[in-house]
Amino acid sequence: MTKFVFITGGVVSSIGKGIVAASLGRLLKSRGYSVSILKLDPYINVDPGTMSPFQHGEVFVTEDGAETDLDLGHYERFTDTSMSRLNSVTQGSIYQAVINKERRGDYQGGTVQVIPHITNEIKERIHRVAKNANPDVVITEIGGTVGDIESQPFLEAIRQFRKDVRRNNALYIHVTLVPWIASAGEMKTKPTQHSVKELRSIGIQPDILVCRCDRKLSEGLKEKMSEFCDVPVESVITSQDAQSIYEVPLMLETEGLAVQALELLKMEQRQPNLSHWKTLVNRLYHRDKQDIRTSQGKLSITATVEIAIVGKYIQLSDAYLSVVEALRHAAIAVGVDLNLHLVNAEDVETKGARTYLEKANGIIVPGGFGVRGIDGKIATVEYARINKIPFLGLCLGMQCAVIEWARNIAKLDAAHSFEFDPQTPNPVINLLPEQQDVVDLGGTMRLGLYPCRLQGDTLAFKTYQQEVIYERHRHRYEFNNAYRNLFKETGYIISGTSPDGRLVEIIELPAHPFFIATQFHPEFQSRPSTPHPLFHNFFQAANSQEKCDNLSVNNTEETPDNLVSKSSIPN
C-alpha cells in the first residue's frame, strides 16, 4: 500500500518546504523506494500559467503540458522522475472542479460546502497521484504557512487523511524557523512552539520537525522543542542553511530524516546509495582548482566561465530558475566554475550591449512574454552573433534571433513578431494557426512534450546524437514559414522541425563557434546527474572562449530599473 507524507510550513513563507520534500524524495529513492511528489497551492488561480514572474517566479512545464509551480522542477531534478499535471493542484482548480460538478448536478441538489465537498476533492487529488503511478510513497507539500486563511481547506483535508488511510500510513512533517537573535546571542524556539500550537489547534500533531536555521541546533534546543512540541527528540531535524540546495539531501540524511520517516511509516529500513549524489556535491564545492578523483579518473577545475542571462524578469532570479540550474548542472559536468550575471534587457536598450556583455564567455536569452525589453534582447543577439560569443536562445530567445537576422542580414524592413507589432510588414514570427481563434490565456498555448526531427550534419544533431528528440514547449507564436526560403538563402540553418516539417523548432548559424536557438525549453529536462546536452555543449563552448575579467557593470546604483545581479555557483 502507498504511504503518504505531508509537509507543512510555519512561521514564515519561503522556508524551504519544497527542497525538504525533494530531498526526502531523493533519500527514499536512494533506498530503492519509488516516490511521487505533489504540490498543493492555496492560491485561487487555476494554475500559475497566467501569473506574473515577478510574483510567482518560473512556470515549470511538465511533459503532459501542465503549467505548474517551480517546486515541481525541484521534485524532478532531485528525484530524476518526471511529474505530471496530477502533481500540481491549486485551490482554484479544486473550486473549479467542485463548481463544475455542482453545475452538472453531481451533488443531487445538496448544499455544496467546504466540508465535505472541497476537502473530499482535495483528498481525491492526493489519491489520484497514488493510483496513477502506484509509488511506494506520495509526498505532499502544502503551500503557504500554517495560520493562513487560504490554507485551511488543505490542512483540514490532510487532517482527515490520516484517519482515512490509518495512522501508520500517513506522516506529518512540519518545517519551521528557528532564528538566531544576535542581540541575545542565542537561538529562539518560541516561533516554532507557536507554529506547532497553531497546527495542533486544527487537529494535526506533527511527527517530525524540520528546523530551518543558520547554524546547527544544540542537543539542548532539540530536547526543548521535543518537550514543548510533543515530538521525539530524534525527530527534531536540523536543516541548516547551505551554499547549495544539492547539499540539503546529504545534510538531512546525516540528521536522520529518512530513517525517522521510514520508522514512523513502518517501512523497511534500507541502506541508502548516495555515492553519486556525494560525487556531485564534491564537484560542486571543489572550487580551489584542486584535482577531484571520480570514478572516471581525475577531474581538474581550472577556469571560471562568465555567463550572462539577458532577461526582463531579473529582479526575481526564480523567474529563470530552471535555466540557472541547467547551467549549474553543465558547470559541474564540464568541471569549471560558473559566474552568473543576470542582465536587464531594458538596460541593454539604453546603454548598449557592450556595456554589460563585453567580458561574457557565453550569452543566453531566455523565454518571456510582452514587448518590454524586446529591443534589448534583439541587440544582445546581434552582439553575440557579430562578436562570435557562444549563444543559446530559448523560446522567445529564438524568436529574437529570427528578428535580428531578418532585420540585419535578410534586410526585411521593420521585421518583427506579430505579438509585439501586429502592423509589421514582415511578421517573421507569427501566431500558430491553431491559436488564431483562442480567447482565453490560461492553458491554451502549445504546451508539453513534442517530437522534433533533427537535420543531419548540424550542430543540433552533433549535440543530441539522435534523429528525433522530445522537448517541452510553452509558446503561442512560431517562425513564419513564408520566410523560410529567404532565411536559408541568406545563410540560416533550420536544423530542427516538427516531424511533419511544418514548425521550425531549432535554428543555428554555421560560421560561429556556437550559435543555436530553440523554440522549446530544454532547461526543463536538465538533471544534476545528466545535464541537458544543449546546456552542456553551450557551456563547453563558453569555456573554450578566452577567459576575461569579471563582467563590467557601469551602474552607480542598483534599482529595479537598472539592476544587474550576480550569483556564483555554488548557490
Swiss-Prot record:
Q: Does the keyword Ligase apply?
A: yes
Q: Where is the signal peptide?
A: none
Q: Which CDD domains match?
A: CTPS_N, GATase1_CTP_Synthase
Region annotated Disordered, chain positions: 552-571
A cellular component term (GO) from this record? cytosol
- Which InterPro entries does its entry note? Class_I_gatase-like, CTP_synthase, CTP_synthase_N, GATASE, GATase1_CTP_Synthase, P-loop_NTPase
What keywords are assigned to this protein? ATP-binding, Glutamine amidotransferase, Ligase, Magnesium, Metal-binding, Nucleotide-binding, Pyrimidine biosynthesis
Biological process (GO), any one: 'de novo' CTP biosynthetic process
Q: Where is this region: Amidoligase domain?
A: 1-267
Kindly state which reaction or reactions the protein catalyses.
Answer: UTP + L-glutamine + ATP + H2O = CTP + L-glutamate + ADP + phosphate + 2 H(+); L-glutamine + H2O = L-glutamate + NH4(+); UTP + NH4(+) + ATP = CTP + ADP + phosphate + 2 H(+)
Task: Tell me which residues bind UTP.
Answer: S13, K188, T189, K190, P191, T192, Q193, K224
Name the residues annotated as catalytic in the UniProt entry. C395, H521, E523
Activity modulation notes: Allosterically activated by GTP, when glutamine is the substrate; GTP has no effect on the reaction when ammonia is the substrate. The allosteric effector GTP functions by stabilizing the protein conformation that binds the tetrahedral intermediate(s) formed during glutamine hydrolysis. Inhibited by the product CTP, via allosteric rather than competitive inhibition.
Q: Which of this chain's residues are annotated to bind L-glutamine?
A: G368, L396, G397, M398, Q399, E419, R476
Q: Where does CTP bind?
A: S13, D148, I149, E150, K188, T189, K190, P191, T192, Q193, K224
Q: Does the keyword Signal apply?
A: no
Which residues does the record give as Mg(2+) binding sites? D71, E141
Query: Its Enzyme Commission number?
Result: 6.3.4.2
Which pathway, per its entry?
Pyrimidine metabolism; CTP biosynthesis via de novo pathway; CTP from UDP: step 2/2
Q: What class of enzyme is it?
A: ligase
Q: Belongs to which family? A: Belongs to the CTP synthase family.
Assembly behavior = Homotetramer.
Q: What does this protein do?
A: Catalyzes the ATP-dependent amination of UTP to CTP with either L-glutamine or ammonia as the source of nitrogen. Regulates intracellular CTP levels through interactions with the four ribonucleotide triphosphates.
Name of the molecule in the record: CTP synthase
Q: Lineage from the top down? A: Bacteria, Bacillati, Cyanobacteriota, Cyanophyceae, Oscillatoriophycideae
